[in-house]
């Protein structure tokens, strides 16, 4: 590509367009969410595994304010929402990227009615937000075991100690 907007930018979907754009995705539609602040191997592996569970993958990102409310530190997120969205959208495994400013993605999950809801292995299925709603519609909820134990918080600790 020479100049112009990269094609992956088209995957960035404002929340108010999610329901309509979800209809155009091949199914089953998989949904996951998180901060994805400093992308690492654990993130990309989990996203690739999530995508393998269906025909498309929607990733919902916490807004910057939502990340701050999680208590990860005043300097988090390191990367602003627009940058995190672009990096996630550039991944081959990702079909759409959206965001939520609430403490949980429950409203987005209800709006886009995914067929499969996924979180990383640190989330037991019974604690995954939206699990009851997805299961009630006949969908599946999966907790994907970590293949590569990585942590953004640990990476930041290591960087700060240098």
List the model feature ranges, each with a label.
Residues 1-162:
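Nucleotidyltransferase catalytic core that binds NTPs
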